[in-house]
Amino acid sequence: MRDNLFIYLQYLLPHTLTSRLVSKLADSENKIIKNHLIRLAIKKFNINLVEAKETDISKYKSFNDFFIRELKDDLRPISNDKNVISSPADGVLSQFGTITDNSLIQAKGKLFSLESLIASSSTTSFTKFATIYLSPKDYHRVHMPIDGKLTKMVYIPGKLFSVNKITTSKVDNLFAKNERLICYFDTIIGEIAVIFVGALLVAGIETVWHGKIAPNYYKDIQTWDYNSAKFNIKFNKGDILGWFNFGSTVIILTSGNNVSFKFEENKNNIKIQVNQDLALITE
């Protein structure tokens, strides 16, 4: 009953307006406001500040600045093996596996189509997926899972439902309904996509090459082509791609048939950390 009420209230909420108001509050540099919000978040979400590069909350200029805090150096070691695909984020590996009949698993008993996720019928190259949920207590920066060159970025406006366990199990096609930013890269295994999925209270998605995109800032699908020689935007495995200004979800899509996950399929909700081995590239 409580879960159904939570879902119902989300349908009533003005998603974009709510998230933009949260964004303004989270961007406030008023010391009293931002320090109070940070203390509340640490207590409410049991945030481990010991891992942060900066542990003095007074040094963060805003609540958002705190939420995208950096980790201490070498806290998340990464494999130098080019055949290892690393986790792009701290969080919970909620679902992963093979894309079958153009469908991905959202939650137990719920599927959604790849075509609806990326808003394109050109889906034939993607064969595997992994979905990582970032809770409010997690490190919020997203890193490159494998060496690659940025070729395209697509912004798709949409709803801003919560992406927690309750909502993913109740709302059909959740990740294809929510606002999302899809980043395409050319890699040694072919094309991959790293998808930032927006959510309720997420005050924006930001990339290191483009900057911040506020919730539903664009009313239509927007595409940026980075494939020309004048851009040549390359990332090494482990490089920072961007971040969420609150908890959300990252989905990775990979091409080819030579990617094998390091976890047993049919298992889910696995705690994972950024740079941890996620999958192997096999011969």
UniProtKB/Swiss-Prot annotation:
One MF annotation (Gene Ontology) recorded for this entry: phosphatidylserine decarboxylase activity
Domain of life per record: Bacteria
Keywords (A to Z) from UniProt: Cell membrane, Decarboxylase, Lipid biosynthesis, Lipid metabolism, Lyase, Membrane, Phospholipid biosynthesis, Phospholipid metabolism, Pyruvate, Zymogen
Site (Cleavage (non-hydrolytic)): 247-248
Main location: membrane
Cellular component annotations (GO), alphabetically ordered: plasma membrane
Cofactor: pyruvate
Signal peptide, first to last residue: none
NCBIfam families in the cross-refs: PS_decarb
Record-stated family: Belongs to the phosphatidylserine decarboxylase family. PSD-B subfamily. Prokaryotic type I sub-subfamily.
Name of the protein: Phosphatidylserine decarboxylase proenzyme
Organism: Francisella tularensis subsp. mediasiatica (strain FSC147)
Underlying gene: psd
